[in-house]
Amino acid sequence: MPKGCLVITVSGLAGSGTTTLCRNLAKHYGFKHIYAGLIFRQMAKEMGMTLEEFQKYVELHPEIDREIDRRQIEAAKECNVVIEGRLAGWMVKNADLKIWLDAPIMERAKRVAKREGISVEEAFVKIAEREKQNRKRYLNLYGIDIEDKSIYDLIINTAHWGPDGVFAIVKAAIDHLSPSGDAGEDEKEKEVG
């Protein structure tokens, strides 16, 4: 792992494996794990709402999104932190490594169904509706298209690897991270000089 202060963001849609990866990174490297989804779930519980109800409530109360974003940005000021959230890569612009995890929706629905003890069909409908609402909300609130992956340094389809495989890929990326932030520039300087 490069020496110094690392800030890593991990983003992805429901069931893509972001929480598992972040827990593994936090355990292996001793990183602090900041989880926007947990903040969101806690706020829903505090208000006595289901996630679906709270999702609709948040659409009418953008200050909730802004508070979650503020907490992520504040957390990025710390050293050796992994920040998990759908918009973490967008919010933490100066992150050393921005990761997006993805998988086909049916694969994600199977994972969510298993995790939440519901049918795959129910999970599929919940995921599809939530993603539609989130995409609209992010576009309206921030002008961010969640489907734009151009800001990410590493994109992994987690349907191809289990948690250990995904961790191994990300670990290799972290362990070989260029301290200058631009490995291509270092190579050009060597070639020219």
Swiss-Prot record:
Pfam families: Cytidylate_kin2. GO terms for cellular component: cytoplasm. It is found in: Cytoplasm. Keywords: ATP-binding, Cytoplasm, Kinase, Nucleotide-binding, Transferase. GO terms for biological process: pyrimidine nucleotide metabolic process. One of its GO terms (molecular function) is ATP binding. Coiled coil: none annotated. InterPro entries: Cyt_kin_arch (IPR011892), Cytidylate_kinase_dom (IPR011994), P-loop_NTPase (IPR027417). ATP binds at G12, L13, A14, G15, S16, G17, T18, T19, T20. The keyword Cytoplasm applies. Belongs to the cytidylate kinase family. Type 2 subfamily. This is Cytidylate kinase. Signal peptide: none annotated. It catalyses: CMP + ATP = CDP + ADP; dCMP + ATP = dCDP + ADP. The gene is cmk. HAMAP family: Cytidyl_kinase_type2. The keyword Chaperone does not apply. Its EC number is 2.7.4.25. Its main location: cytoplasm.
